[in-house]
Swiss-Prot record:
It is found in: Plastid, Chloroplast. The gene is rps15. Gene3D superfamilies: S15/NS1, RNA-binding. GO terms for molecular function: structural constituent of ribosome. PANTHER family: RIBOSOMAL PROTEIN S15, BACTERIAL AND ORGANELLAR, SMALL RIBOSOMAL SUBUNIT PROTEIN US15M. It holds the Pfam family Ribosomal_S15. This is Small ribosomal subunit protein uS15c. It comes from the Eukaryota. Keywords: Chloroplast, Plastid, Ribonucleoprotein, Ribosomal protein. GO terms for cellular component: chloroplast; ribonucleoprotein complex; ribosome.
Length: 93
């Protein structure tokens, strides 16, 4: 899978000291989102997991919006990873 290769690349690159970096957070949120999405395909009436999915989607959106406002250069570097993970572009004000 493509996403597992990204996890291994970023995990090796970042090690343990940079787990709070935006790239690592976006990647970990994306893996959680995909796992919950596949769970919800099997269990359509699991509303608590659906709520958790919406919360994680919001967290990922806020992290990306924060980065686009604070550091535009790093956000442009992250665009390649965002496009490869099939994340839709966030709407900024």
């Amino acid at each position: 899978m493509v996403r597992n290769s990204f996890i291994s690349i970023i995990s090796q690159k970042e090690n343990k000291e940079n787990r709070g970096s935006v790239e690592f957070q976006v990647l970990s949120f994306t893996t959680k989102i995909r796992r919950l999405t596949s769970h919800l395909k099997l269990h359509k009436t699991d509303y608590s997991s659906e709520r958790g999915l919406r919360k994680i989607l919001g967290k990922r959106q806020r992290v990306l919006a924060y980065l686009s406002k604070k550091n535009r250069v790093r956000y442009q570097e992250l665009q390649d990873l965002i496009s490869q993970l099939n994340i839709r572009e966030t709407k900024t004000r």
